[in-house]
A protein has these predicted regions:
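Carbohydrate-active catalytic/glycan-binding domains of CAZyme proteins
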Residues: 16-102
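Solvent-exposed, well-ordered amphipathic alpha-helical segments
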Residues: 2-3, 77
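Sec-dependent N-terminal signal peptides
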Residues: 3-15
């Protein structure tokens, strides 16, 4: 019975797929969501390819984007809202703009 149940769970998990990705065409992580005036705003970290060889195996986050939706189906990318050169506590060129809610 235990083997059968494990096989069933494995089979069900492999068929799952996302039908409405919020963010496509870029890497993101650590999202924070807020609701203002009936609209959901999503603030994720924005991961980019590293311009510095030593950071190739690490995250590289120089800015934050914001996305919004009034129906949770259609999302609008508002682009970069802040970058590392505008934040006094971020060392320029460190690419450490992660976890927007911290």
């Amino acid at each position: 019975m235990k083997t059968w149940m494990c096989a069933l769970m494995l089979a069900l998990s492999t068929g799952a797929s996302a039908q409405n990705p919020i963010i496509s065409g870029q890497y993101s992580a650590d999202p924070t969501a807020r609701v203002f005036n009936g609209k959901v705003y999503l603030y994720p970290s924005h991961d980019i390819p590293s311009p510095i060889e030593k950071l190739k195996e690490w995250f590289c986050m120089a800015d934050y984007h914001v996305f919004s939706s009034s129906n949770l189906t259609e999302w609008q990318d508002h682009g970069v809202i802040v970058s590392q050169d505008k934040v006094p506590w971020v060392q320029d060129g460190s690419y450490t703009m992660w976890a927007p809610d911290c």
